């Protein structure tokens, strides 16, 4: 596992350190899986890392509740990517009525082939369309900020879903 610091303005990355990932047998003996091991390692270095940054960027492998929740509880923010088949919901637009019971939590599942553009903010980007919105991610059991990118390179039905736990 490698930890690096990214300088976005200069398009550079500097390595802070690395550690050999434990093998499956060792992880099993510890009662952990790979996702648990990575989150525990980052959290164990929390004070050192948070003196430099609070945002962790991880690949789609880590877009799991068992990684995201411990990281957020340790005051880290996470940016990652969802798989294209992820289940996401629009937050409800209903207001409280004063009647007994809780209003519904969601207005429906998001269909990325037919995205409701009235709920999105569009951003100008090269070679595609980018939309931002707030969604509920079933896999993470939390609300996240979502960026949906539709590339304009001839690929139909191929969108990319990036999320952030930071509001």
Predicted feature locations:
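Extended, non-catalytic structural segments that build the interaction scaffolds
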Residues: 155-167
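Short, solvent-exposed loop/turn segments that connect beta-strands within catalytic domains
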Residues: 9-12, 153-157
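An internal, acidic/charged active-site-proximal segment
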Residues: 20-149, 154
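Active-site-proximal beta-strand elements of phosphoester/diester hydrolases
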Residues: 16, 146-147, 162-164
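Active-site-proximal, Lys/Arg-enriched surface segment
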Residues: 1-15, 75, 129-134
């Amino acid at each position: 596992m490698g930890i690096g610091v990214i300088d976005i303005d200069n398009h550079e990355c500097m390595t802070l350190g690395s550690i050999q990932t434990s093998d499956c047998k060792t992880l099993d003996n510890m009662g952990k899986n790979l996702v648990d091991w990575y989150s525990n390692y980052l959290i164990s270095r929390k004070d050192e890392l948070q003196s430099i940054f609070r945002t962790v960027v991880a690949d789609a492998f880590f877009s799991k509740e068992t990684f995201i929740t411990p990281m957020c509880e340790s005051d880290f923010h996470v940016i990652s990517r969802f798989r294209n088949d992820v289940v996401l919901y629009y937050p409800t637009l209903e207001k409280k009525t004063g009647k007994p019971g809780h209003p519904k939590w969601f207005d429906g599942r998001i269909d990325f082939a037919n995205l409701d553009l009235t709920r999105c903010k569009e951003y100008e980007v090269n070679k595609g369309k980018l939309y931002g919105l707030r969604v509920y991610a079933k896999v993470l059991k939390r609300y996240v900020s979502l960026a949906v990118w539709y590339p304009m390179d001839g690929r139909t039905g191929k969108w990319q879903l990036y999320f952030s736990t930071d509001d």
